[in-house]
Amino acid sequence: MHFIYDCSLFLFKIVIVIFFIIFVSSIILKISRKKNKNFGILSVSSLNDHYELVKNSIIVQLMDKKTKKLWNKKNKMLKRSTLLTNNNKLIDKDHNIIVVRAQPTLYVIDFKGGIAAHEVKSLREEISSIISVAQKHDEVLLRLESSGGTIHGYGLAAVQLQRLRSRKIFLTISIDKIATSGGYMMACVANYIIATPFSIIGSIGVVAQFPNIHKFLKKNNIDVELHTAGVHKRTLTIFGENTPEDRKKFVEELNVAHDLFKKFVKTMRPSLNIEKLSNGECWFGSIALKKKLVDDINTSDDFIISRIRKFNILHVKFKYNESIIKALFYKKLKTINNLIYKYLNNKLF
């Protein structure tokens, strides 16, 4: 009797805990939905201020106590909050104009792309915001990191960058780590490409792979029916039997995509020997420079620092609002999603 009572009490506690978790989760979801009325936030920060702060932090540590005291006193006197307006003028908190900005602006944006290129959602907002305020002599630096992915995803990302070129906004793309396949499709849109010596560049090709378990299913007496309206609605399948005709058609589709890729790169960088470079091979940055795939060997950091005196440098980042639940599991979901695209989806750049 005692045992039954203890078991019942234990089960009752479990039920209470489950109901509590459901209750708390529902409250969190309601709060997150209310917060998500605005679909995202555009943050703009000054990299001039960032590098100045870093420099001053080191300078202060090198001072003796007396000099440090004078520095801090002078720093407090010089502090005055300023804001940047759309017509490129600096104003104080009372909306009084202090000084007209004479320098052009270098807008810095980042793109770290996955296989599905979902990051293009933020990229398009960042580019739209820059286009809306950019003036003559303003430039854009895109810090790119991507090993490529779906054709439609990276095709859209490359076209988004073309919006800057079509408006005569000078675009520099820096590759600190990797820009291959669809990543290089984006990079080639730039007016000027810089890369680090050991970054990985190239892979102008198309690949597609996924398993076929038809023999396994047949061995276990499992039938799969696939019905299509249209001869080439589905070429290769995972579960069904793939015929030589299906494979031939699939390879044709790969070649069509490859030809489009080659033409796009050649249009953006006419000096390339595209037939020689479009075999899917990758090169280190220093070798890619000799093959004219990039224009200079440099890091994005040095590129920015070299322009601090000539440009007002702003880092622009658009972030979509997400529910708390989605934010907690986003990385895991992204990994699973990339695996699905890699092994079960169609052709990839």
From Swiss-Prot:
Catalytic site positions: 181, 233
Organism encoding this protein: Buchnera aphidicola subsp. Baizongia pistaciae (strain Bp)
Entry protein name: Putative protease SohB
Mode of membrane association: Multi-pass membrane protein
Gene Ontology annotations of biological process type: proteolysis
EC number from the UniProt entry: 3.4.21.-
Lineage: superkingdom: Bacteria
Lineage: Bacteria, Pseudomonadati, Pseudomonadota, Gammaproteobacteria, Enterobacterales
The keyword rRNA-binding is annotated on this UniProt entry: no
Entries under NCBIfam families matching the protein: PRK11778.1
SUPFAM superfamilies linked: ClpP/crotonase (SSF52096)
Gene responsible for this protein: sohB
Localization in the cell: Cell membrane
Family of the protein in this entry: Belongs to the peptidase S49 family.
Pfam families assigned to the protein according to its UniProt record, in alphabetical order: Peptidase_S49, Peptidase_S49_N
